[in-house]
């Protein structure tokens, strides 16, 4: 096997997402063909997904409850242990590219105003990621909080999940609102692994909330045995250190398909979860809800 590329647009993301995931995988392959390592490929794929306004990352990210703020998280990791992340970065087009620059510093994670200032110093232009769709999602969230929306009459599994999740974790009913992550895992021809992820977080969140993505071992992890990227409710993923847990199973010799299935099974059915896994013996995509994804193996 010369390469393995897996991409996803987030568990419960729109059904129209697979073609964008395929284009992201193509961008990753282009990075490999240009001589880049696995890390460059994972970053390229994730940046493409950030640019698709249907996904909750980069352009199209969820507004916070204040209706003004978009705070984005992103992270990248290579199998040699290099890691870089940003949390609550604002008004940049591609947070994953800023995270990649953090990886080149002595730091692991930059947050808030410091992360945004870092991006500006490196020449990342100011970019407004707000879309009309994000404003509509925010309006539905406020209606649910006021009690004049989200009556629970949902007609599909994803909608029912969001209604249950809102009641379980935020104590109110709500219309379906995606609050997930985009990401990629890659193995290159030299056996190097990498993972990358990006998210706009949840509308049902206070300003300053940080999810799983920028926490090493929670949303992503990569090492000499493989790479893992997760998507779902960030707090629940972080509590279980999902990516590192699945990676440790790979290191113990568990097959990627089995490791991915076990990772999803760590969560009760009410919590939507998905993982991408690539190891030395193969690759796997697993989720308990719809999750647009793509893979290239060559």
Question: Where is each model-derived feature located?
Answer:
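Alpha/propeptide regions of enzymes that mature by internal proteolysis
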Residues: 1-298
């Amino acid at each position: 096997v010369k390469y393995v590329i897996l991409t996803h647009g987030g568990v419960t993301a729109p059904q129209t997402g697979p073609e964008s995931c395929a284009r992201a995988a193509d961008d990753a392959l282009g990075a490999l063909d240009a001589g880049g390592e696995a890390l460059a490929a994972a970053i390229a794929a994730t940046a493409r997904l950030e640019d698709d306004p249907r996904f909750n990352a980069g352009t199209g990210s969820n507004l916070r409850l204040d209706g003004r703020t978009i705070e984005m998280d992103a992270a990248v990791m290579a199998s040699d242990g290099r890691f870089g992340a940003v949390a609550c970065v604002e008004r940049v087009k591609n947070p994953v590219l800023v995270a990649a620059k953090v990886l080149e510093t002595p730091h692991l994670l930059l947050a808030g105003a410091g992360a945004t200032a870092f991006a500006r110093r490196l020449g990342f232009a100011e970019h407004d990621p707000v879309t009309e769709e994000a404003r509509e999602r925010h309006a539905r969230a406020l209606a649910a909080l006021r009690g004049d929306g989200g009556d629970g009459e949902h007609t599909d599994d994803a909608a029912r999940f969001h209604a249950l999740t809102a009641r379980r974790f935020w104590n109110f009913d709500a219309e379906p609102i995606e609050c997930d992550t985009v990401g990629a895992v890659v193995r290159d021809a030299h056996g190097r692994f990498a993972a990358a992820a990006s998210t706009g977080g949840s509308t049902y969140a206070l300003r300053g909330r940080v999810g799983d993505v920028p926490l090493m071992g929670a949303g992503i992890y990569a090492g000499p045995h493989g790479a893992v990227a997760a998507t779902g409710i960030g707090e629940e993923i972080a509590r279980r250190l999902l990516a590192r847990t699945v990676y440790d199973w790979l290191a113990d010799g568990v097959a990627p398909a089995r490791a991915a299935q076990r990772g999803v099974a760590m969560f009760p059915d009410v919590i939507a979860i998905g993982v991408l896994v690539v190891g030395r013996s193969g690759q796997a995509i697993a989720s308990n809800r719809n999750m647009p994804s793509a893979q290239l193996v060559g």
